[in-house]
Regions:
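Conserved, mostly hydrophobic/aromatic
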Residues: 31, 40, 56, 86, ...
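Hydrophobic faces of well-ordered beta-strands that scaffold small-molecule active sites
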Residues: 2-13, 38-42, 61-68, 94-96, ...
Length: 332
């Protein structure tokens, strides 16, 4: 049982999306001065690699994980390139967000996802940076039951299966009929094949936790039927799906809904469950948790509350519960 590292997405080192862009040095300085983080998460663009290396060394904040999104049929070489960049920074993992549709426009198959992952894993094992497939909207894994299906395919070929869990993408779909129509998961729910609510026995998050698939985790709070982001639109005119709920009570005018911290209970329960599993189970695969309050359209675009402060306070809460949980299991 190892202590968990707690980090922050570089995309979340910003107060609001209306602020002037920050230099990378300023972002690293903010993260370091908060004393809340052990690392930061990012795959640097090629032209910024030297500046990232300088800031990592200056502020003693390593890049323990990279992240990128990929379209199969187009980005296989980019995937390997980003794993290589991660290895040069000492990143343990690289979070791969694989889009739901192939370059040819068809939905990606489980076999295609498995082959993509295995190719990255074979390369990553040689260079020291391992891929984790992320549970995420707009990706193949938004059809949540497919995660276990791909895992079985990968394991049957003798490979270890690793995921990045971002359970905000599960919690916001609870009591959310519109979101449950995507990939027809409402039918899986009605048939009893898929349980989203972490308070219910056999829920999908508990299944993934017990499987030890989860090696990396993203922490960004949401609530059931999370309010949509009415202050931001996609290019097609649709408003943000709403996959972020403030962890810290916003000041008046910073958020359009009445904030209720009690509604965070389901999201917090999953964090506590995975931390409990980690410190009670020597077989736990989890190594690190990245806070990921961010500003894109489906998340925090247009809001007045501080994205960075939510990352800091969430990280401090996670640190607190990990310390309490560790002591509980040591004393028992």
């Amino acid at each position: 049982m190892n202590d968990l590292f707690i980090g922050c997405s570089v995309f979340g080192i910003i107060h609001t999306d209306s602020d002037s862009p920050l230099t990378l040095e300023k972002q690293f300085s903010m993260a370091a001065e908060s004393e809340a983080f052990d690392y930061v998460e990012k795959t640097p663009p090629l032209e910024e690699i030297d500046e990232y290396k300088r800031c990592c060394e200056k502020f003693k904040l390593p890049l323990r994980c990279g992240i990128w999104f990929y379209t199969l049929g187009k980005d296989e070489d980019l995937f390997l390139q980003n794993l290589k960049i991660g290895s040069e920074f000492g990143s343990v993992y690289h979070t791969a967000q694989d889009m739901a549709h192939h370059e040819d426009g068809q939905l990606v198959t489980n076999e295609e996802i498995g082959n993509f992952y295995i190719a990255g894993l074979n390369y990553g094992e040689k260079i020291g940076c391992l891929p984790c497939l992320e549970v995420h909207v707009n990706m193949w894994s938004e059809d949540f039951l497919r995660v276990e299906q791909v895992a079985q395919m990968v394991q049957e070929q003798g490979y270890k299966f690793r995921i990045t869990l971002d359970h905000s993408h599960i919690i916001f779909k609870i009591d959310n009929p519109e979101e449950q129509k995507i990939f027809d998961i409402d039918k899986d729910i009605n048939d009893g094949k898929l349980i989203l609510d972490p308070y219910e026995e056999g829920n999908i998050c508990d299944q993934w936790i017990k499987s030890n698939f989860i090696h990396h985790m993203h922490a960004r709070s949401t609530i059931p039927n999370n309010p949509k982001n009415i202050h931001a639109q996609h290019p097609d005119g649709s408003i943000g799906r709403g996959i972020q709920y403030p962890f810290v009570k916003p000041l008046p005018g910073q958020y359009h809904e009445k904030w209720d911290g009690k509604l965070l209970d389901r999201w917090k329960l999953v964090v506590q469950s995975i931390v409990d599993h980690h410190y009670s189970n020597k077989g736990s695969s989890l190594e690190q948790i990245t806070t990921e309050f961010i500003t894109p359209t489906d998340y925090g675009a247009g809001w007045g509350y501080s994205i960075f402060n939510n990352n800091v306070q969430c990280a401090k809460w996670i640190r607190q519960i990990t310390n309490e949980t560790k002591l509980k299991f040591i004393n028992n």
